[in-house]
From Swiss-Prot:
Native source species: Candida glabrata (strain ATCC 2001 / BCRC 20586 / JCM 3761 / NBRC 0622 / NRRL Y-65 / CBS 138) (Yeast)
Protein name: Spindle pole body component 110
Gene Ontology CC: cytoplasm; nucleus; spindle pole body
Coiled-coil region list: 176-723
Subunit comment: Homodimer.
Cell compartment(s), UniProt: Nucleus; Cytoplasm, Cytoskeleton, Microtubule organizing center, Spindle pole body
Region (Disordered): 15-121
Amino acid sequence: MSDIKNFEFTPIGYIKSKSGENDAKETLMSPTGASVRSPGSVGHVRKARRRSINDTVNSSRVENDNDTFDETLPELEMRKLPQYRRVPESRTSARNSGAAPQEEQNRNDYSDILSKTSNPIKDQEQKIKDLEHENTVLKVKNVSYRSLLANYSGGSSQNNINLVEEVSIWKTKYLETNEKLLKVKQDFESYVQKMEQEKEVNTDQEKTKEPEVIPIDNPEYIKEREHILEELERVTEDFKNLRDRYNDLEIKFLSIQNELDEKKQEFESSTARLNEEIHTLKSTIDDKDATISEFKRKLGNAEDQLASIDDQNGNQNQKLLHDLKEREDAIDGLKEDIIEKENAIVHYKEEIQDKQNQLKESESKYAEVQKEFEDFKRELKKQTFEFEDGKKSTSRQLQELSVEKIQLEKQVCNLRGQIEKLEQQHRLTQSENDGLRTKLKHIESDLKNEKSRTEVKIKDLTSDLEDARKNLGEANNTIKELHHEIIKNATKSKDQLSEEVVEKDKEIDQLKHRVQRLDEELRTSQAELDKATKNREVDHELEIRRLQNKHEIEQESLKRELAHMTDEKERLVDLHRLDIETWERQIEALRKENENLISREHKESNNIEITLQDKNIQIRRLEADIVQLNEERNDILNKLRSLEQAKDRYKSEMKDALETISRLRVDLENNKSLKDSKDSLIERKYEKLKDEFKLMKKGYLDEMIKLQSRNRELNSDLQKRMDPSISTSANTTLADKLDYYKLKYNDEVRHNNDLRVINEYLNRVLRASAQDIRLNLLKVENDLNIDIHKENVPLSAPLSSSGGRPYSSSYTREFDKYDYRYRQKGKRFKTVALAVLAVIRMYRAAKKHNWNEQRIRYLQRKIIAKEDRITW
């Protein structure tokens, strides 16, 4: 027989005592120590090594292990335990001799019950290990998700910064819970040390006296245990909150990841667009630099021209012509500059048009957002009739969006004002350019007039000089001829010679006077010509200086205008960039707000659909219950009617009975001479009928009371079921799956409908093409028959009934419809409108298809993420 008598139950473990006089009394042992030492070992108990709390933190087995012990002590079964206490040695022999089977049975019962009990210290230790392991796993997951998010987004997104801040907050909360956990550990260790000290004290006490059992209802033990359990519950609740928050963060991470993908695409498109704009702006800057260099080159050319004009003052006529040509070239250059300016103005107009187009695109985007917002508002209005609670929040959001809309409209007005200012500046520059053009035209006309006048004067002077030179030549020739005649006629008579000499002298004097007069006229004309040329040179120099100063002033003004325009261009580029950034931020904020509102509304709509489905199910159940209750009510009413009919029947029977009784009484009174036996018989019959009537009445009353109570219960049950406050909580995963399968089913149905429509269309096309082929074959056969008939006609007969013209069949005339003459008529408005309507419908269908695909992918990822999530 075993030493069951030496064991005693305690809430901590076993106590084994020795019954011999020479054996030392041993200390209380934990199950770990008891397992180390065999029950039959001799000597003092070796203290077992206490296992480390952290030895299973890195083990993956903890996730799948079930709790070894119960969370609480089964006190009811503990009370049923047999109180094994130390028995005096005088009794042991009698118990061992007489009650061995009973002792064996008690031992078995004791071991069964003891296996069901729990060890609170080990349970607490195991729970602490589990919590530590879960905290480490959460820590590792948090670090991995943070690193993944940082690697994916590069730390540029504000959402990532918010998430990092939120993760740091949860890290501090985790540290607080870890500190609380350490505090619980310290409390647990202090409790273990206290228990060990109590064990040591108990061992010291056991050396002098028998071991006492710590009662289960010890107040200190109960208080300590309750404190530990409260701490454990608090820690587990914090851990549950952390786990819920982790699940929310994981869902949020998936949504943010989707948003990051969309933002990445938008960022790439915006960078491409901005690169194109930068390229165009660089090209415009290069063009402006080229124009500036061209202006500088032309300025140098003009200065060189002025220097050459100063150097070539000798040949004035050629200089004037050359200057006029150069001025014409300069005017042509200025015209080219003006054309370039006009091209630049056109380019600026195109840039302004591009800005306006971008503004229109932003306005169209804003209109689309506003349209989506209006659709969303209409949906909200539809839902506000059923859900009054969400009305305040949605109205507040609508007010915020309206404020943002007003701000956006103000910004649009400011941009329009800036565009109007730019247009005014453009008009001013255009008017200045027009003034410059008119001035250049006046200068050109003045120069042409001066040129023509000077050319006329020069021609007149040259003609006068040539006439004078001719006269001088003629005079010299006549003088020479006279000298020759004098020499020839020397031999003539003196008188004739003297007369002739006198005449010739007179002629010579006349000629000399004429030559002097002509010389004086030549000198005066030469002086006038020199004076006129000097005056013209002075005038031309003054005009050239004036034009040079004017050209320099215009050049300086053009340079200033060019610098101002470049500054204005840079300012407009910066302003446009800032406007684009602000618009992108506002659009991004509106998009986020819209997405949040859409997601929130979608969630609310999903919840509403789920609640509606639940309500529909409840309504169907209630309708079925109502139908059943109505059937029961009809049955009860039928029973009541039958009972009332029976009651009326019994009343009539009672009336008949009373009438018979009254008649019998009358007969009895009339027939007093009847025997007493007959009277007694009538009385018995009357009493019997009366008792039956009372029993029947009582039964009917009880049945009516039961039916009324049943009716009240059914009405109360119906009211409870129809109470809208009693509703079951919806399962989000089930709702997501329902939405996913619903969308998949709708897509399949739509696809099948499209295939059916395509099939019908192809069948119609095949039927129509077959019919056309049959008609064409009939026409060809008809033509062949006609050709055969024509071959059989004799040669003397005409070619056809149409007066010798070739045969024109209906088949050939049929294709004349497709000639260019028949296609001169334009398309009708209805055809164009139907085509536009078809395009709009196709666009809407494609947009809805894309949205359904995105929703299906999102639900699929969400369901997979929820199913793959580790559940603790």
